[in-house]
Amino acid sequence: MAVPKRKTSRMKRGFRRSADAIKAPTYIEDKDSGELRRPHHVDLKTGMYRGRQIFTPKVREEA
């Protein structure tokens, strides 16, 4: 049966458990539109990513 050779220290145990914490998602303010978006994701309102037009957003008709 596999048994640890040394006792795991409190610090090492804490480092391992820190990855289990639930963290709030990160948002950044878009430079062009001023909208909040996730980093490294396309801005859904404008369709831009890193200065390039990825797609043209659909215009929603309000009735």
Swiss-Prot record:
One Gene Ontology CC term in the entry: large ribosomal subunit
Comp. bias intervals (Basic residues): 1-16
One MF term in the entry's GO annotations: structural constituent of ribosome
InterPro entries: Ribosomal_bL32 (IPR002677), Ribosomal_bL32_bact (IPR044957), Ribosomal_zn-bd (IPR011332)
A Pfam family it matches: Ribosomal_L32p
Listed GO biological process terms: translation
TM regions (residue ranges): none
SUPFAM superfamilies found in the cross-reference section: Zn-binding ribosomal proteins (SSF57829)
Region feature (Disordered): 1-22
Keyword tags: Ribonucleoprotein, Ribosomal protein
Leader peptide range in chain numbering: none
Family per record: Belongs to the bacterial ribosomal protein bL32 family.
HAMAP family cross-referenced by the UniProt entry: Ribosomal_bL32 (MF_00340)
Name the UniProt record assigns to this protein: Large ribosomal subunit protein bL32
